From Swiss-Prot:
Record carries keyword Nucleotidyltransferase: yes
Record-given protein name: DNA-directed RNA polymerase subunit beta
Catalytic activity: RNA(n) + a ribonucleoside 5'-triphosphate = RNA(n+1) + diphosphate
Organism from which the protein derives: Anaplasma phagocytophilum (strain HZ)
Role played: DNA-dependent RNA polymerase catalyzes the transcription of DNA into RNA using the four ribonucleoside triphosphates as substrates.
HAMAP family: RNApol_bact_RpoB
Family from the record: Belongs to the RNA polymerase beta chain family.
Lineage of the organism: Bacteria, Pseudomonadati, Pseudomonadota, Alphaproteobacteria, Rickettsiales
C-alpha cells in the first residue's frame, strides 16, 4: 500500500488507501510494536497449546506430569505416549451460525502395560521398574489412541466461540507468587508502633505468614489460622535451640585477661553507641570516656589508629546473652544456658570456675534486636515432635493422629510439589528478594527460604531494609487466557487421574485396553464450566471494532484469586508510578470498579512470566539510538529515563545539557550524559482508546476517561466517515481489530463482488504458481450487541496489493481507518434553552441525510419440539390468525426474506398439539352446517415483539439429522451449495487463467507449424485451454514441460474439487440439535434507527448529551453563505468540564474543511489544467510545510496530483497525536491559509428571523458519535401485562413489559393535593386489587362509570406475614363506620 512514507518520483495514492494525514507528530513511532494489538491473547493461548518452540508449558507437559499412572498393587501401569490435536470440524462463521462451540478434537496415545507375576523366559521383554533393581516381565502391552474431549480453540481474532457466542477471556492482575514484607503503618496499636510482617504467597498451596506482636515476639500463621511462635516452625523443621541461635545471631568471643575481657574491635558495631564504660585498649589506656556517643567517623578513626581489640571490664558483661551453654569444668553442671543473659551472680561464678573465654550473641538492641531469642524463650523446652503436633492441632483441630501422619501432613504443607507450588515466577521472586541461588525448577519451599525470610523480617525493626509496595507492578503479574485454561486443564486431568486409579483397583486387567480407563466427559465438563460461567470469561463487547480491541486488552483485578470490589481500598485502585507505559492511567470504568479494571498501555507487552514490560530507546553518551529495549518495572527504577518530548538535534543528540528524567518513581534533573533511556513515544502511557482522542493533553483527566469509555459505546453508522481531526492511530486500531480484511500475501486482485475478493498470489521474483486467496466477506451479520457487521471491498480488479494491506472495510471503518462517528458542523451557542444541561440541538437535515442512521440486527428464534401429544409443526395455516397477518409467510410457514415486519407480525407459523376437547352440541351443529375445521392444536407461532419494526434479511433453518427437511431448509441448503460452488469456480478460474498464460508463453517460444496463420499468437488466439494442452503434448520438443505443467494443473483442480466435496459432505451431515428439538428457525430482522430526541450523543472529549430537539433546517443558525449548522452545543458545557480539546478540535476541523474547500475552488476554477495543477501544488506544499508529504506532493505527476486534490475536497485530514497536538500558532496559520478568521469564530444568522447574532460564534467541524443508549430501546409503555405471583402487582421494567412504579413519594404528592379517589384507584384497582380489576373491566365494557374498590392483595400478603409470626389478624366490619380496621 502506498503511503506518505513511500515517497519518491511519481508517488501515487492508491484508490483503496486513506488520504495521508497532515501530522503534527514530533517523535518517531515504532509501528512494529502496534502491528498486533491482541498479541496478549494469542501469545498466551499459543504457549498453552505448545506452539512456541522451547516452551516449557503446553498440553504435552501437563500430560507428562500426570503419567505414568500405576496400579496401587503394582500389577500394571498406564503410560502417556503422545498427544494429538486435530482440526476443527466447522469454521468460525459456521460455529456462530449453528450455535456450537468452535473447538478441536483432542486425542492422546496411551500405552497400557500389565506385568507378569510368574517366572518368565529369557525371550520375553524385560522392564526395569522403580523398585530397586527388580525386573518384571510384560504379560501384555496395548497401545491405543483415546479421545479425551474437545478443546475450545481461539479464533484468529483472539476470541472463543462458545455455544455460538463470541466470548473473551479477560486477563487478570493478581499479586505475584513470592515473599512480601509489609507493615501496618502504625494503625494496629494506639501507640503508633510499626508492626512488621512477611507473607510467602505460593501459586498453589498454603499461605505462610510471619508477624511481630506489640512485645516484639515473632509469630507465624498458616492459611490465616491461629498464630504460633515462629520457633515452633523452626523446631518442626528440625532445628535445635543452639541451631536457631547460631543461625540468627553472630557470635562475639570475649577472652579473659588480667584487666578485663578482650574483645575484637569491629567498626560497624560501634555506630551510634553510647558507652557505659571507658573504652580502653588492651594495655588499659583510656581512649574514650564513658557516656560518650561514638559516631561512625570516630570508630573509623580508632580503627585507622590501629585499634584491633579493646577491654571490657569484668562487670561489663552483665546483661549480655551467652551463645552456648557455660558449663562447670569440674562437675559438668550448666552455669548459664545458651541464650540466657549474664546476671551479677553469674559473674561471681565465672571468676570461681576460672572460665577463660565466653562466646556472646551479638545483640546490641540498636542494630540487632533479641526478637528471635525472646520468641525462643517463650517455650525453649519444646521438642520437634511437640512442635509438629501443635501445628497439626491448629490446622486440624479435633483429630489425634500418630507421629508419622503428623510428619507427612507437615511435609505436604510446603515441601511436596503435589500440594504446594510456588511456580517458576515465585521461585525467581524469592531468589531475588532473599539473594538465594536455588534452581528455578524447585518450586516448593526449602528450609533456607523460611530461615532467610525470618532473617530479613527481623532486620526491619532495626531500620535495615524497606517494606514492599504491593501495588508496584514488580509485585503484580498478569494471568492471561492460556494460564487460566492450563489451570482448568490440570483440574480436569487430576479428576481423570483419580478416576483411573479407582478403576484400576477394581478392574480385571486380562482384557482391559486404555480406552476403558478414560472418560472424555470429565475434562470437557471442566473446560465448559470455565468458559460458560467464569467471572473472567465474558460476553464480548462487540459494539464497534474499538470495543472489541479494548475488551481483549483489558486487565481485571477481580475474579477468582483476585480482589473483591467491596474490599478493595483506595491504594490498589490508584495510579502508581510503575504504571507508566504499562497500564493506562486514564481508561477505567466510572462506577464501583474504578481502578480495578484497567487497560494495557499501547506499546506494553507481557513477558513469559506475566510481568508487564514497556519499551524504551537506548541512550549512549547523550545520543539516542534506534535500539529499543523492553524493561520491567523493577529494572526501570535503576535507570534515568528521559521524556519522549526531549529536544534532539539532527544527530539524535540531546540539545539541552540538563534534562528532567524519571528515576525510582521521582523526577530528577540530570546531565544528558547520565541519561540511560528515552521514551519511545509520548503516547506510550495511554491505552488504545485514549490514544484516539486528539488534544488529549488539553482535557481534564475525568473527561478524558469518559471520552475513552464512550468511544467504545459508539454504534457503527450506515456510512462510515473517518475523522478529519484524528490522531494517526485510526488505521492501527482498524487493522488490529479484525474488523477489516487484510491481504494474507502479495498478489493481484482477480475478481471482486459484494461477497468475495479473489486475489492471485504474486511475487515478482518467482515464476511458479503461488496459489489463490479467496476472502469471503461478512455480510449483514449480527454482533453480540445487535449492531450490524458488514464488510465492503475497497479494491478493484487489477489492483496490486501487498501483505497486510486493507482490502475490505468493516463496520465503522473508512478506507482502513477507524470511523466511529461523523464530522458535523457545530456551533457553540445557546438556542432557545434547548441545549440546557448538555442537551443537543440537531438539524433536521442531519436526519434527512441519514448522517447518524444506524442498522441494528435483531435475532428471533423459534424452536419446534417433539411433545408427548406429538410433534409441533411449522405451517402457514395457523388457527385463529387471519390471512392478512400470514401474507408475508411462504408456503412452509416461514417469513420471506425482504418482508417488512412490524410489532405483532408472525415470523414463523407454528402449531402445538393439544389434548382433544369435547365440543358442546351447539358447536358440533355449527361445525356440521358450515364445515368449519376443528383444530386439535393451538397457535404457538413466533411473533415480532412490540418494540421492533424492520426488514427480514436472513433466515436459518436447522433440521435435526434424520428428520425430513422442509422446502425452505432445502432452498437454504441449495443456496449454500451454490456459494461453495462459486468459491470452487473462482479458484479454478484463477488456476486456469495462470496456466493458460504460461502455456501460451511456452508454445509461443516453440517452433509450431503456422497452418496459414500469420504468427504463432494468431494461431493460438482462439484456442481453448484443452486445445493448447493437446498442441503442447503433441510437440516433442516441449511435451515433457507441458506434461509437467498439466500434472500440476490437474493436481490443483482435483484439490479444488476435493475441498468443495468436503464442504458439501459437512452440509449434508445435518445438525445435532438438543434432545427433543426437531427444528430451529432463526429469523434476522434489520432495524433502522434514525436519530431522534432522546438519543445519546458524545464527542471524543467526554462531551456527552442527549438530543433535546430536531429543528427544521430552515430554522437553524446559518453561516454568511447560507450553510446551516448541523449541531448546536452549549458553550457553558466547556469551562466547568475543562475539556478544551473539543474547542481545539473544532478550530482544526474548521481549518481542515476550509482548506479542502479552497482546493475544490481551485479545481473548479475553469482555468487550463497546467496553471491549476501548479497552483494546487504550490498551495499543498504550503499546507504540508515541514511534512514528509510536501516531498510527495512535489514528486506527483499532474494526473496523480489532480486525483489527490479531488480526494481533499471534503477536507484535509489532520493528525494531532496524543501529547503532540499542534500549538495555537500552527492552528492559526492553517486558518489563515484557509481564508477564514484566525480566531475560529464567525458571524452566524438566526434561521428564523434572518438577523445576525450580536456576537461572533465559535463554529467548526467536530467528530460526534451516536452511542448505543438509543431512546427506542429505552422508551416503554404498558397496557396489559404480567402480574407478580405473590403481590399481584404489575412487574417492572421493559424486559418484563412492566408498569411505572407509583411509589411512596408519589402517594405523598396525591395526599398533599387531597386527591383521595385518585389515590384509592392507584393503590387498588390500578395495582393489586384482583377482584376490583375484574369489576372495573366489566364496568368499562358495559359503559358504566361506577366501580368499587376492594382490598389490595399486598394487604393480604401483610396479613399472611403477620400470621406467620403467630399473630391472629382478623378483618371485622364495624357497624358504626363504613371503613375496615384491623384488631
Amino acid at each position: 500500500m502506498s503511503s506518505a512514507g513511500d515517497s519518491g518520483p511519481g508517488y501515487v495514492l492508491n484508490d483503496f488507501d486513506a488520504v495521508p494525514r497532515l501530522s503534527y507528530a514530533r517523535s518517531i513511532d515504532i509501528r512494529d510494536s502496534l502491528s498486533d494489538l491482541i498479541r496478549i491473547q494469542r501469545d498466551s493461548y499459543d504457549a498453552f497449546i505448545g506452539i512456541d518452540e522451547g516452551s516449557s508449558g503446553g498440553i504435552q507437559s501437563i500430560f507428562q506430569s500426570m503419567f505414568p499412572i500405576r496400579d496401587p498393587l503394582g500389577r500394571a501401569v498406564l503410560e502417556f505416549v503422545s498427544c494429538n490435536i486435530g482440526e476443527p470440524q466447522y469454521d468460525e462463521y459456521e460455529c456462530i451460525k449453528r450455535g456450537i462451540t468452535f473447538s478441536v478434537p483432542m486425542r492422546i496415545t496411551l500405552r497400557f502395560v500389565v506385568w507378569k507375576v510368574q517366572e518368565v523366559s529369557f525371550k520375553e521383554v524385560k522392564y526395569v521398574v522403580d523398585e530397586g533393581t527388580l525386573e518384571r516381565s510384560v504379560k501384555y502391552m496395548k497401545e491405543q489412541e483415546v479421545s479425551i474431549g474437545d478443546l475450545p480453540m481461539m479464533t484468529s481474532y483472539g476470541t472463543f466461540i462458545i455455544n455460538g457466542i463470541e466470548r473473551v477471556i479477560v486477563s487478570q492482575m493478581h499479586r505475584s507468587p513470592g515473599v512480601f514484607f509489609d507493615s501496618d503503618k502504625g494503625k494496629t496499636y494506639s501507640s503508633g508502633k510499626l508492626i512488621y510482617s512477611a507473607r510467602i504467597i505460593p501459586y498453589r498451596g498454603s499461605w505462610l505468614d510471619f508477624e511481630f506482636d506489640i512485645k516484639d515476639i515473632i509469630y507465624f500463621r498458616i492459611d490465616k489460622k491461629r498464630k504460633l511462635p515462629v520457633t515452633y516452625l523452626l523446631k518442626a523443621l528440625g532445628m535445635s535451640n543452639n541451631d536457631i541461635l547460631d543461625t540468627f545471631y553472630d557470635k562475639v568471643l570475649y577472652v579473659r585477661s588480667d584487666k578485663g575481657w578482650k574483645v575484637p574491635f569491629v567498626v560497624d558495631r560501634f555506630k551510634g553507641v553510647r558507652l557505659s564504660y571507658d573504652l580502653m585498649d588492651v594495655d588499659g589506656n583510656v581512649l574514650i570516656k564513658a557516656n560518650t556517643r561514638i559516631t561512625l567517623r570516630i570508630a573509623k578513626k580508632l580503627y585507622a589508629d590501629g585499634l584491633r581489640e579493646y577491654l571490657v571490664p569484668f562487670a561489663g558483661i552483665s546483661g549480655l546473652f551467652v551463645a552456648t551453654d557455660l558449663v562447670d569444668p569440674a562437675s559438668g553442671a550448666v552455669i548459664v544456658s545458651a541464650g540466657e543473659a549474664i546476671a551479677a551472680e553469674h559473674i561471681v561464678k565465672l571468676e570461681l570456675f576460672d572460665i577463660s573465654e565466653i562466646a556472646f550473641l551479638n545483640i546490641d538492641f540498636l542494630t540487632v534486636g533479641p526478637y528471635v531469642l525472646n520468641t525462643l524463650f517463650l517455650d525453649r523446652h519444646i521438642t520437634q515432635e511437640d512442635a509438629l503436633f501443635e501445628i497439626y492441632r491448629v490446622l486440624r483441630s479435633g483429630e489425634s493422629p500418630n507421629l508419622e501422619a503428623v510428619k507427612s501432613f507437615f511435609k505436604g504443607l510446603f515441601f511436596e510439589p503435589d500440594r504446594y507450588d510456588l511456580s517458576v515466577v515465585g521461585r525467581i521472586k524469592l531468589n531475588s528478594h532473599l539473594r538465594l541461588d536455588i534452581d528455578e525448577n524447585l518450586t516448593v519451599l526449602t528450609k533456607d527460604d523460611i530461615v532467610h525470610v525470618i532473617k530479613k523480617l527481623v532486620l526491619l525493626p532495626d531500620g535495615e531494609g524497606v517494606v514492599d509496595d504491593i501495588d508496584h507492578l514488580g509485585n503484580r503479574r498478569v494471568r492471561s487466557v492460556g494460564e487460566f485454561i492450563e489451570n482448568q486443564f490440570r483440574v480436569g486431568i487430576l479428576r481423570l487421574e483419580r478416576m483411573i486409579m479407582d478403576y484400576m483397583s477394581s478392574v480385571n486387567f486380562d482384557n482391559a485396553v486404555p480406552c476403558d480407563f478414560v472418560n472424555p466427559k470429565i475434562l470437557a465438563t471442566v473446560l465448559k464450566d470455565f468458559f460458560s460461567s467464569s467471572q473472567l470469561s465474558q460476553f464480548m463487547d462487540q459494539t464497534n471494532p474499538l470495543s472489541e480491541v479494548t475488551h481483549k486488552r483489558r486487565l481485571s483485578a477481580l475474579g477468582p484469586g483476585g480482589l473483591t470490589r467491596e474490599r478493595a481500598g483506595f491504594e490498589v485502585r490508584d495510579v502508581h508510578p510503575t504504571h507508566y507505559g504499562r497500564i493506562c492511567p486514564i481508561e477505567t470504568p466510572e462506577g464501583q470498579n474504578i481502578g480495578l479494571i484497567s487497560s494495557l498501555a499501547i506499546y506494553a507487552k507481557i513477558n513469559k512470566y506475566g510481568f508487564i514490560e514497556s519499551p524504551y530507546r537506548k541512550v549512549i553518551d547523550g545520543v539516542v539510538t534506534d535500539s529499543v529495549e523492553y524493561l520491567l518495572a523493577t529494572q526501570e527504577s535503576d535507570y534515568y529515563i528521559a521524556d519522549a518530548g526531549a529536544a534532539l538535534d539532527e544527530n539524535n543528540r540531546f540539545v539541552d545539557d540538563m534534562l528532567y528524567c524519571r528515576h525510582g518513581g521521582n523526577f530528577v534533573m540530570v546531565k544528558r550524559e547520565d541519561v540511560n533511556y528515552i521514551d519511545v513515544s509520548p503516547k506510550q502511557i495511554v491505552s488504545v482508546a485514549a490514544s484516539l482522542i486528539p488534544f488529549l493533553e488539553n482535557n481534564d483527566a475525568n473527561r478524558a476517561l469518559m471520552g475513552s469509555n464512550m468511544q467504545r459505546q459508539a454504534v457503527p453508522l450506515l456510512k462510515a466517515e473517518a475523522p478529519l481531526v484524528g490522531t494517526g492511530m485510526e488505521s492501527v486500531v482498524a487493522a488490529g481489530s479484525g474488523a477489516v480484511v487484510l491481504a494474507k500475501r502479495d498478489g493481484v486482485v482477480h475478481r471482486v463482488d459484494g461477497s468475495y475478493i479473489v486475489i492471485r498470489a504474486f511475487d515478482k521474483n518467482k515464476d511458479e504458481y503461488l496459489g489463490v486467496d479467496i476472502y469471503k466477506l461478512r455480510k449483514f451479520q449480527r454482533s453480540n450487541h445487535n449492531t450490524c457487521i458488514n464488510q465492503r471491498p475497497i479494491v478493484k480488479i487489477g489492483d496490486y496489493v501487498r501483505t497486510n494491506d486493507v482490502i475490505a472495510d468493516g463496520a465503522a471503518i473508512d478506507r482502513g481507518e477507524l470511523a466511529l462517528g461523523k464530522n458535523v458542523l457545530v456551533a457553540f451557542m445557546s438556542w432557545q434553552g434547548y441545549n440546557f444541561e448538555d442537551s443537543i440541538v440537531i438539524s433536521s437535515d442531519v436526519v434527512k441525510r441519514d448522517v447518524f442512521t444506524s442498522i441494528h440486527i435483531e435475532e428471533f428464534e423459534c424452536v419446534v419440539r417433539d411433545t408427548p401429544l406429538g410433534p409441533e409443526k411449522i405451517m402457514r395455516s395457523v388457527p385463529d390468525v387471519n390471512e392478512e397477518s400470514l401474507s408475508h409467510l411462504d408456503d412452509v410457514g416461514i417469513v420471506n426474506i425482504g418482508a417488512e415486519v412490524s410489532a405483532g407480525s408472525v415470523l414463523v407459523g407454528k402449531v402445538t398439539p393439544r389434548p382433544p376437547v369435547s365440543l358442546p352440541p351447539e358447536t358440533k351443529l355449527l361445525v356440521t352446517i358450515f364445515g368449519e375445521k376443528v383444530f386439535d392444536c393451538v397457535d404457538s407461532s413466533l411473533y415480532l415483539p412490540p418494540d421492533v419494526e424492520g426488514t427480514v434479511i436472513d433466515v436459518h433453518v436447522f433440521v435435526r439429522r434424520g428428520v425430513e427437511e422442509n422446502d425452505r431448509s432445502l432452498l437454504i441448503k441449495q443456496s449454500e451449495v451454490n456459494s461453495f460452488r462459486k468459491e470452487r469456480d473462482y479458484e479454478i478460474d484463477v488456476v486456469s487463467e495462470y496456466f493458460y498464460d504460461e502455456l501460451k508463453k511456452l508454445l509461443c517460444s516453440a517452433d509450431l507449424p503456422l497452418n496459414g496463420h500469420a504468427d504463432v499468437e494468431s494461431l493460438l488466439a482462439a484456442k481453448s485451454l484443452e486445445a493448447l494442452w493437446e498442441i503442447g503434448l503433441s510437440n516433442p520438443k516441449i511435451s515433457a514441460k507441458v506434461a509437467d505443467m498439466k500434472g500440476k494443473f490437474d493436481e490443483l483442480i482435483t484439490e479444488a474439487h476435493s475441498k468443495f466435496d468436503q464442504k458439501i459432505d459437512k452440509l449434508n451431515y445435518g445438525y445435532d440439535l438438543p434432545q427433543g428439538v426437531l427444528t430451529i428457525v432463526k429469523v434476522f430482522v434489520a432495524v433502522k434507527h434514525n436519530l431522534q430526541p432522546g438519543d445519546k450523543m458524545a464527542g471524543r472529549h467526554g462531551n456527552k448529551g442527549v438530543i433535546s430537539r430536531i429543528v427544521p433546517v430552515e430554522d437553524m443558525p446559518h453561516l454568511e453563505d447560507g450553510t446551516p449548522v448541523d449541531i448546536i452545543l452549549n458553550s457553558l458545557g466547556v469551562p466547568s468540564r475543562m475539556n478544551i480539546g473539543q474547542i481545539l478540535e473544532t478550530h482544526l476541523g474548521w481549518a481542515a474543511v476550509n482548506l479542502g474547500h479552497r482546493v475544490g475552488r481551485m479545481l473548479d476554477s475553469g482555468e487550463e489544467e497546467g496553471p491549476v495543477v501548479e497552483s494546487i501544488r504550490s498551495f499543498l506544499s504550503e499546507v504540508y510545510e515541514g511534512q514528509k508529504l510536501k516531498e510527495d506532493v512535489a514528486s506527483m505527476s499532474d494526473e496523480a496530483l489532480l486525483k489527490f486534490a479531488n480526494r481533499l475536497r471534503r477536507g484535509v485530514p489532520m493528525a494531532a497525536p496524543v501529547f503532540e497536538g499542534p500549538k495555537d500558532a500552527q492552528i492559526s496559520r492553517l486558518l489563515e491559509l484557509a481564508d477564514v478568521d484566525p480566531s475560529g469564530q464567525v458571524d452566524l444568522y438566526d434561521g428564523r428571523s434572518g438577523q445576525k447574532f450580536d456576537r461572533k460564534v465559535t463554529v467548526g467541524y467536530i467528530y460526534m458519535l451516536k452511542l448505543h443508549h438509543l431512546v427506542d430501546d429505552k422508551i416503554h409503555a404498558r397496557s396489559v401485562g404480567p402480574y407478580g405471583l405473590v403481590t399481584q402487582q404489575p412487574l417492572g421494567g421493559k424486559s418484563h413489559f412492566g408498569g411505572q412504579r407509583f411509589g411512596e413519594m408519589e402517594c405523598w404528592a396525591l395526599q398533599a393535593y387531597g386527591a383521595a379517589y385518585t389515590l384509592q384507584e392507584m393503590l387498588t384497582v390500578k395495582s393489586d386489587d384482583i377482584v376490583g380489576r375484574v369489576r372495573i373491566y366489566e364496568s368499562i365494557i358495559k359503559g358504566d362509570s361506577n366501580f368499587e374498590c376492594g382490598i389490595p392483595e399486598s394487604f393480604n400478603v401483610m396479613v399472611k406475614e403477620l400470621r406467620s409470626l403467630c399473630l391472629d389478624v382478623v378483618l371485622k366490619q364495624d357497624k358504626e363506620f363504613t371503613s375496615s380496621k384491623v384488631e
